[in-house]
Structures are given as structure tokens and as C-alpha cells.
Amino acid sequence: NKRTVEALIKAGAFDRLHLDRATLLASIDLAFDYALAQEANTHQVGLFDLTDDGHGSSTQEPALAEATPWDLRERLQQEKAALGFHLSGHLFDACANEVRRFVQTPLAHLEESREPQLLAGIVCDLRIINGNRGKLALFRLDDGSATVEASADESVFSGNTALKEDALLVAQGRVQFDRFSGALRLNAQNIIDLPTARHRFGKHLLVQIGPLAASEPGPSFSRVFSDHPPQRTTTDSGDVLMRGLPVRVRLGIRSNDGSIVEGTLALNEDCQFYPSDAALASWTALLPQGQVHVVYSGS
């Protein structure tokens, strides 16, 4: 049953055979076709099928299909689709290193304060209820260190796509002690997703190239800029704002004598992009050796 095998692959049951679950999932049809062919040939031994030991020779096993490996987030989401929960890690781990550059406080170290605080975590148990003042979103934020109950008024989440189950949410609001639950509770006043946080807190994207030979061409970025342009937003007064992240290139050139000269170039304002996950994946595909990252204030 292909569906059963698919679920087992997503859950990691075949990890000891092959660690790349995406490749295994893409190879299911090949595996079943090969198994059916083997079964059909089991009792059909011809004159030219006999080997030295008298047994029927099998057809050659097909190579595994090619597939893009899953990142941590995709792997955990596939586990939840198969099992109903994340088995091999926490969703926050997929973005923890980046998020901690602009949200330093783990939820385990959260303290009550009248001043608004900036928090980040994965949205869990999201539900919308009808309150006395309109709709109210109730959810939990979980960053792997702890969880905190949270709420957001309709004016905060209405028309905002950031509030989704299993999504990374950056929330600003007041944290107060809830006598009913006996724990801290967040009243979110502003919520954004990770791409918006990159634009808001990031200074620029740093792209490291080289060292290259003096005559060696560098990679072309034009496709990334055309596929992921800055987002246009219109203010209440009619002004058009561009939401994009600038790019800086750190370039190394190797001269004929072997010495290396390095310099950093700031691309012009036309060379900006919206820092979505897909955009960063495109940058990483161009420079896969960890040569691309968002630079945040203070880093």
C-alpha cells in the first residue's frame, strides 16, 4: 500500500536505510514498479536467465529518484502530517539562530512587565472566539524553552496572515500574571511573521563571493531580484512604500601572485528584494556554502 509506505517515510521509519526522506518519497513509484516486476519474474526462468548457480537472475535495481532534500521545518511538518505531532525536533529550531538575533529573550526567561516586550515562538492551539468586543484570537507561543498563553484582539489579527498554526510569530505586547491560570499571559498588540521581521529588524543581506580569479565571472543575481521584488504597500494617506532589503556583496579577488584582495560593495537601491523564505532559498541555491545571511542591528 503506497499510502502506508508514504506515511512511514514521513515518520522516519526508513531513516536507517536512507536518511534523505524526500528522495525516498520521490522513489516510491520506482520501488513499487520494481517489486511488481520482480514478483512477475519469480517463476519465469528462461534459458538465458540462468546464472552459474542455476537461479534466475534479477533485473537491476533502479536508482533512487532525485529530489530536493527537506529542510528541518519541512521534515517536522511531514512528521506531523503522518503522526499528528513533531517527533525529531521542535519547529522553533528551524529558525532559532536567526530569531535570536532580534528577539534575545527565551520564553523561559519571560517576566511580568508593564512595558511592551518583543517575543517569538511557534503558534500552537490557535482558536478564534467571539468576545464582548468582537472576535478574539487565543493561542500559545512555544519556543522550545517554554510556552506562554497569548491573546490578540480582532484589530490586531484581522487581515494579518502572520497568525497561523505551526507558524513562527513575532509578537509585541504586555506580559502580565493571569490569576486564573496562575501563569504569565501575553496580550499581543502587534504581530508579524518572519519575513516581515527580517525587513523590519534586518540591516541588509550580506552575500560573500570568492575568492575568484581576476578573470573569473561571478554569479548573476538578476533572477533573484526579478522573482522576489520588494513589496509595495500603500499608507492611509496614499503614499506608496517599498518593503525590501538592501544587498551588500563581500567580494574576494585572487591575483596572479596568489594574494587576495577583499572589499564590500553596497548595491544600489534598485537591487532590493523582499526577504521571504523562498527568496533566501534562491540566494542559498546560488551560493550554497553558507555565504548568504541577513545582518541584523547589533550583529
Per-range role (PLM):
Residues 18-19, 87-201, 211-223, 229-243, ...:
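Single-stranded nucleic-acid-binding OB-fold domains
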Residues 68-71, 75, 87, 161, ...:
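Catalytic cores of large soluble enzymes that bind and process phosphate-bearing ligands
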Residues 190, 198-299:
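C-terminal effector modules of nucleic-acid-centric enzymes and ribosome-associated factors
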Residues 3, 78, 118, 274, ...:
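Charged, alpha-helix-enriched surfaces in structured cytosolic catalytic cores
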Residues 12, 43-49, 84, 134, ...:
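Glycine-centered flexibility motif
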Residues 1-112, 176, 187-189, 205, ...:
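Sliding clamp-binding short linear motifs
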Residues 47, 79, 83, 121, ...:
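A residue-level signal for conserved active-site and pocket-lining positions in enzyme catalytic cores
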